[in-house]
Amino acid sequence: MRNYGFNSKILRIDLTNKTTSVETMEENWYRIYGGGGLMGTYFMLKETPAKIDAFDPQNALIFASSIIAGQDGPGLAMFRVVTKSPLSQGIGEARCEGPWGQYLKGSGYDAIIITGKAKDPVYLLIEQGEVTIECAKELWGKNTNEATQQLEQRYGAEDIQCAVIGQAGENLVRYASIVTAHSIQAARMGTGAVMGSKNLKGIVLKGKKIPQVFDPEGLREVKEYFTKNMPNNELSMWQKEAPGFSASADLSDYDTAYMGVDNFKANLQVETSNYTRSKYMEYYKGHHTCPGCDNDCIKYIDPGMGIPKATGIHQEVTGTMGPNIGNTNLKTMLEANVLCNLYGLDPTSLGFSISFAMESFENGLISKNDLDGKDLNFGN
């Protein structure tokens, strides 16, 4: 019986014992659990002990696709990372778009479930269904751009997609992210820290064979509908037009817009700030297109640090690493975004952690004695 839209296979990897296995799932199971966060949650509830720490080797790190993920259409190049979060100690889910999600579906597996902890740093190479556990000692300590470039040189940049952690994940920062395509993050819930706790530097996917769908003509019609109508949707329009959704705080064509300032103690009128679309355009370099989607929503806005591939930006960083921490300098915010991509840090969690600490400092809850004599005022 042909399986339409899915591979029927779940890959399991035990890093402690250096073993792999494949579990075959029935069609009815997919009709219930589908994929993505629901699939990941199913395995977490079924197999992960409830009271273990997020950094316990028994904690599963799950990369999950879904039924139509990877097909040729808007919004379908997606995957989810599901694990026990070191931030909440509950089930955490991080969404990520981009080519890695398409390659995951094309790897021959619908999900990868990783348990255990490697004795030394490793990365996984999955090539047309074949899995090897490779030494990553020479990659450990490198930022995400350096690690990805080294893997691309080894296996061919045109043939692979990489998901890696940076120094934040290696050092178990609880809001560390996993970075794909140099700057597209699975950002939330500390998934990169769980990956680091397993001594897993990255996952390399090589080659892809996307499963057929039952009704390719119907899928084509749906894609054409979205492709035709997305430009007429204001949200999609902001995403597609330069400089992109990161500048969406500037709504001056529609209404007066404001940004939160100093951990939302005040607000700032955007059109009188340094965060206008015209200011962003001074640094705009281009866009990234996810497979099958014409919306080009990931923009590259380069502050001139010499690492153009690491300049991909999402909208949240404007709100968290800008006026929220008293930062009125757009270039400084853009530099912070690049550093988050390089180190593998969720800029949203980082920005709100900083603003909370700054307000705590100003309210006397944190002192200079706690900060090696440094001031932590907003804008410092």
Where are these regions (language model features)?
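Intrinsically disordered, low-complexity segments enriched in small residues
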Residues: 1-95, 99-380
